[in-house]
UniProtKB/Swiss-Prot annotation:
<dbReference type="InterPro" id="IPR004623">
    <property type="entry name" value="KdpA"/>
</dbReference>
<protein>
    <recommendedName>
        <fullName>Potassium-transporting ATPase potassium-binding subunit</fullName>
    </recommendedName>
</protein>
<feature type="transmembrane region" description="Helical">
    <location>
        <begin position="66"/>
        <end position="86"/>
    </location>
</feature>
<feature type="transmembrane region" description="Helical">
    <location>
        <begin position="537"/>
        <end position="557"/>
    </location>
</feature>
<dbReference type="GO" id="GO:0005886">
    <property type="term" value="C:plasma membrane"/>
</dbReference>
<keyword id="KW-0406">Ion transport</keyword>
<keyword id="KW-0813">Transport</keyword>
<keyword id="KW-1133">Transmembrane helix</keyword>
<keyword id="KW-0812">Transmembrane</keyword>
<dbReference type="GO" id="GO:0008556">
    <property type="term" value="F:P-type potassium transmembrane transporter activity"/>
</dbReference>
<dbReference type="Pfam" id="PF03814">
    <property type="entry name" value="KdpA"/>
</dbReference>
<feature type="transmembrane region" description="Helical">
    <location>
        <begin position="6"/>
        <end position="26"/>
    </location>
</feature>
<keyword id="KW-0472">Membrane</keyword>
<keyword id="KW-0630">Potassium</keyword>
<dbReference type="GO" id="GO:0030955">
    <property type="term" value="F:potassium ion binding"/>
</dbReference>
<feature type="transmembrane region" description="Helical">
    <location>
        <begin position="135"/>
        <end position="155"/>
    </location>
</feature>
<feature type="transmembrane region" description="Helical">
    <location>
        <begin position="382"/>
        <end position="402"/>
    </location>
</feature>
């Protein structure tokens, strides 16, 4: 138990220590200031901008920024879709893997361009090396960079005033890749290789075991994809077992690096925001609220798993476990990680829009599974995905400012900018589109016979598997309750739709809000006379409960039919 506390403390301290330097670095990159990696990144950026031509030089309005973002995503979607359909005739395919069916290729392409990485396939049997490297791994970089671009555009809109432009998407995209994601990923990949993660394009090995049977050992360019999988909060594993596989996550060191990587950029953006708007206290307040939400989620999930079998009263089981006083739930977990390493990793991955797992979420106790759902359902705002976590949290921040200001009889304002009705329309659109998407698609799936046939469990847990799939898709997480066999035409198409709506619907609202904020006057006098201090402890509490009430209550009735009912059924066994 003491070792668990030490690990947790070390993890939190590590995240806190890297937040300021990495946040400052991101600030310098996007403000065109000198950085230590200019010598490495600038040559790539020059070639990239030369190819783009004039489109990368002019500042863009919010509408132009969004149009460029969508245009790029459409091109990326077509690129990935074609490769997945034709991978059977493309090179670097020693296992002679055939092309995917159209519904599955559609789902996978949408999944990777939206930074969701939902996988209705098994990576080692359904995707060639060529497709892994040129389609999926590339999208791990660019989809994360797209989310980062949106966050940076939003931050600019708060810092700037009385102008119409929020930056240039193409320029921001290159900076995100060449200065941030690519250099850090290279370092992480090298560490992974030294830790035993394979990096090759060899054919799978056929070995004879001592029992006289043949075993196939997969190979592949795993280290390079694993690095960006975590750093870019993508989560899509090279193998079906994801980070529970010893090739993806062989040691406690790689496990720790993956967890830190998942939170690194999201945490750093809180400081980037504070530095950019000239109020670092504001950034640390966001960091603090995120951290408290994370700790609460981790504690509930861990306690639920440590005492996950206490409802069993069999004398034989009590005789075996009587010495420890409680029954921990080790089903679906790697014995080399144990309960706490598993719950810590999965709390991190479901809090961020990562979706990687080092244990089987479907085998968790109902309450622990519910916490994973809540982490996603509130909008992935507990640090969240690269960029997406920050702009999702900012929507709740705006709502808290609006509610708090009205409660004290003041005109709503944030950092000297007046918050008006149009701003709140975009804010609420961003906050409600994903929950609406989840509830509609879950309700439809619950009455579709083909979905029932895809379930391995019935009743409350079966409903939880359906609910989890659409929460994960709409909030761009990508993890799953594996009891749902997701490779059906209906699920491939509807989950793809939920991913598209959850990603680009929210991004559209965020960029439109940015376009509104950037045009406003910034009055320091307005900020000073307002009695709503947005860096105070009271305001932090207001933001905390706004997230819980607005984010949590929208999905609570569905949770009541799923994991809560599932837990009650266990308690009354």
């Amino acid at each position: 138990m003491i070792s668990n506390f030490i690990l947790f403390a070390l993890f939190i301290v590590t995240i806190a220590l890297i937040t300021k330097p990495l946040g400052s670095y991101i600030f310098r990159v996007f403000n065109n200031e000198r950085t230590y990696l200019d010598w490495l990144a600038k040559p790539f950026q020059r070639v990239y901008l030369l190819v783009l031509g004039e489109s990368s030089k002019k500042e863009q309005t919010a509408k132009a920024y969004f149009f460029s973002l969508v245009s790029f995503s459409v091109m990326a979607f077509i690129f990935v879709l074609v490769i997945l359909l034709l991978q059977g005739i493309l090179p670097l395919n020693p296992q002679e893997i055939k092309g995917m069916s159209f519904p599955q290729a559609l789902n996978t392409a949408v999944s990777f361009i939206t930074n969701t990485n939902w996988q209705s396939y098994s990576g080692e049997t359904d995707v060639s090396y060529f497709a892994q490297m040129l389609a999926l791994a590339v999208q791990n970089f660019v989809s994360a960079a797209v989310g980062l671009c949106v966050a940076i555009a939003l931050i600019r809109s708060v810092a700037r005033h009385e102008t119409a432009t929020i930056g240039n998407f193409w320029n921001d995209l290159g900076k995100g890749i060449f200065w941030i994601l690519l250099p850090i990923s290279i370092v992480i990949a090298i560490v992974y290789i030294f830790q035993g993660v394979p990096q090759n394009v060899m054919a799978y090995l056929h070995v004879h075991t001592l029992a006289g049977t043949e075993q196939i050992i997969p190979q592949g360019p795993i280290a390079s994809q694993e690095a960006i999988k975590s750093l870019g909060t993508n989560g899509g594993g090279f193998f079906n077992a994801n980070s529970a596989h010893p090739y993806e996550n062989p040691t406690v060191i790689t496990n720790y690096i993956q967890m830190v990587s998942i939170f690194a950029i999201a945490a750093a953006l809180t400081y980037t925001f504070g530095k950019w708007v000239g109020n670092t206290k504001q950034g640390w307040l966001i960091f603090g609220v995120m951290l408290v939400l994370f700790i609460i989620s981790l504690v509930v999930m861990t306690i639920s798993e440590l005492h996950g079998l206490d409802f069993l009263h069999s004398k034989d089981i009590q005789d075996i476990y009587g010495q420890v006083g409680h029954l921990s739930n080790m089903e679906g977990k790697e014995s080399r990680f144990g309960v706490f390493y598993s719950t810590l990793y999965n709390t991190v991955s479901t809090s961020a829009s990562d979706g990687g797992v080092n244990s089987v979420l479907d085998s968790y106790s109902p309450l622990a599974g519910m916490m994973a759902m809540l982490n996603m359902a509130i909008g992935e705002v507990i640090f969240g995905g690269v960029g997406a976590g920050f702009y999702g949290f900012f929507m709740f921040l705006m709502l808290a400012v609006f509610i708090g200001s009205l409660m004290i009889g003041r005109a709503p304002s944030f950092l000297g900018k007046r918050i008006e009705a149009n701003d709140m329309k975009w804010t609420m659109f961003a906050l409600l589109i994903s929950p609406c998407c989840v509830l509609v698609f879950t309700g439809l799936a619950a009455v579709i016979p083909s979905v029932h046939q895809a379930l391995t469990n019935s009743g409350a847990h079966g409903f939880s598997e359906i609910l989890y799939a659409y929460i994960s898709g709409a909030n761009n997480n990508g993890s799953a309750f594996a009891g749902l066999s997701a490779n059906t035409n209906y699920l491939n198409i509807t989950i793809a739709l939920s991913m598209l709506i959850g990603r680009f619907g929210v991004i559209f609202a965020v960029i439109m809000l940015a376009g509104s904020l950037v045009k406003k006057k910034r009055s320091l006098q307005m900020s000073e006379i307002s009695s709503l201090d947005t860096t105070s402890f009271i305001f932090a509490i207001l933001v905390f409960f706004t997230i819980l009430l607005i984010g949590g209550l929208t999905i609570f009735p569905a949770l009541g039919l799923g994991p809560i009912l599932d837990q009650l059924n266990l308690n009354f066994l």
